[in-house]
């Protein structure tokens, strides 16, 4: 690890939501190859076209990890990163992932920077029962990225965001277009905007 406390990011989202597209964009567009990144890739996830692109980045080291009893279990780390990014297992309980990452961060003297949820809008618009899972993710999140909106009514997207505004959610809701966000630095800015105070305890 470097002398300064590395900043830790956690990305929630279901498989197929474009998490790794966004991850590549944040690293490539937000860090511009200037900082060493340790990317925790969840075991058992289906491959993504962006896996090879992430592996090709000179500043990125990749380590496999899994959740076990709300704890982080990972392969050996040989990097000294400035930024650490955990991709949460797509089928995991958001609370378990939050507990695991907080414990790992505290143990390794790191600092939580931001929690990000990538929303698969097309899936959620057709599977309302999944909203409780996304609610849990967004409860912990500073930034909510609305992705996979193809074929989704604009009113649904607007109503989705307004629903959280009515609950006084302080999170930023941003659109993803073709796997990219408008301003990666805005997403990575280590400013807490989450409803949950769990990571601040």
Positions of predicted regions on the chain:
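Phosphate/Mg2+-binding loops and adjacent switch elements
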Residues: 85-168
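C-terminal accessory "lid"/substrate-recognition subdomains
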Residues: 153-201
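Short, hinge-like loop/turn segments at secondary-structure boundaries
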Residues: 56-57, 134-135, 192
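Pre-Walker A adenine-sensing motif
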Residues: 1-3
């Amino acid at each position: 690890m470097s002398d300064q406390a590395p900043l830790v990011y956690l990305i929630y989202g279901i498989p197929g939501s474009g998490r790794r597209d966004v991850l590549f964009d944040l690293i490539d567009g937000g860090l511009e190859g200037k900082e060493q990144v340790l990317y925790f890739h969840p075991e058992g996830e289906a491959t993504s076209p962006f896996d090879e692109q992430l592996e090709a980045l000179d500043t990125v080291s990749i380590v496999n990890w899994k959740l076990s009893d709300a704890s982080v279990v990972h392969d050996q780390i040989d990097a000294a990163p400035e930024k650490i990014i955990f991709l949460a297992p797509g089928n995991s309980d958001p609370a378990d992932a939050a507990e695991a990452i907080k414990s790992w961060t505290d143990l390794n003297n790191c600092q939580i920077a931001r929690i990000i949820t990538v929303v698969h809008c097309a899936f959620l618009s057709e599977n309302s029962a999944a909203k409780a899972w996304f609610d849990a993710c967004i409860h912990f999140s500073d930034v909510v990225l609305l992705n996979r909106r193809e074929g989704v009514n604009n009113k649904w997207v607007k109503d989705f965001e307004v629903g959280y505004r009515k609950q006084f959610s302080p999170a930023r809701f941003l659109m993803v277009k073709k796997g990219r966000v408008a301003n990666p630095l805005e997403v990575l800015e280590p400013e807490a905007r989450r409803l949950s105070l769990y990571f601040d305890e």
